UniProtKB/Swiss-Prot annotation:
One of its GO terms (biological process) is L-tryptophan biosynthetic process. The keyword Thylakoid does not apply. This is N-(5'-phosphoribosyl)anthranilate isomerase. Belongs to the TrpF family. Pathway: Amino-acid biosynthesis; L-tryptophan biosynthesis; L-tryptophan from chorismate: step 3/5. It comes from Bacillus anthracis. It catalyses: N-(5-phospho-beta-D-ribosyl)anthranilate = 1-(2-carboxyphenylamino)-1-deoxy-D-ribulose 5-phosphate. It holds the Pfam family PRAI. GO terms for molecular function: phosphoribosylanthranilate isomerase activity. Its EC number is 5.3.1.24. Keywords: Amino-acid biosynthesis, Aromatic amino acid biosynthesis, Isomerase, Tryptophan biosynthesis.
Length: 204
């Protein structure tokens, strides 16, 4: 099971997450309490292992700005949380992830229309897109087609207490956590470690 730790804002957390086995780190460039500047993201990314995916999170940002930040920071993928369509995705010409809030099984069908490398299924948006700590009914994704499952990233309120059930139900390619590994709004490296251990054990 692949694991993504999202909302990285400091070097120490990023390095520790990689040491514990994170496969991807997320850097939020949209409005969020976890927003990071491109300058700091670049400093952190330069120190990370080459095999770890560096994913930039954007919401309804222009193609030009996304391309500039991606190039300057050394991002490997972009994660799109707004109303982006396939025309914009093709113009980006960057490996991409489309985030969709799940409210019904029909969201699986909608997901198959996006020309992205991965689909991130999340709880429906609130004030901020993602990172709100809320789960959604995972059984809505229990019967997805194999070709979609192989590119599915599961997010939305995951933590050490529910990750095993979430993986058993959805069987995604990757799981994504942010608030579920925080204490009082800050990333907690011990929670990150335990989350990664539990997620990886589920796929053995």
């Amino acid at each position: 099971m692949k694991v993504k730790i999202c909302g990285i804002t400091d070097m120490e957390t990023a390095k520790r997450a990689c040491e514990y086995g994170a496969d991807a780190l997320g850097f939020v460039f949209a409005e969020s309490k976890r927003k990071i500047t491109p300058g700091l993201a670049k400093e952190i990314i330069q120190e990370l292992p080459a095999n770890v995916l560096k994913i930039g999170v954007f919401v309804n940002e222009s193609v030009e700005v996304i391309q500039k930040i991606t190039g300057n920071c050394g991002l490997t993928h972009v994660q799109l949380h707004g109303g982006e369509d396939n025309h914009q995705i093709r113009r980006l010409n960057i490996p991409s992830i489309k985030s969709l809030g799940v409210t019904s099984e029909s969201d699986m069908k909608n997901a198959q229309g996006y020309e992205t490398d991965y689909i991130l299924f999340d709880s429906p948006k609130e004030k901020f897109h993602g990172g709100n700590g809320k789960t959604f009914p995972w059984e809505l994704l229990a019967h997805m087609p194999k070709e979609l499952r192989e590119k599915t990233i599961l997010a939305g309120g995951l933590n050490t207490l529910n990750i095993e059930e979430a993986i058993r139900t959805v069987r995604p390619y990757m799981v994504d956590v942010s608030s579920g590994v925080e204490t009082e709004g800050k990333k907690d490296v011990e929670k990150i470690k335990q989350f990664i251990i539990k997620a990886k054990e589920c796929s053995k």
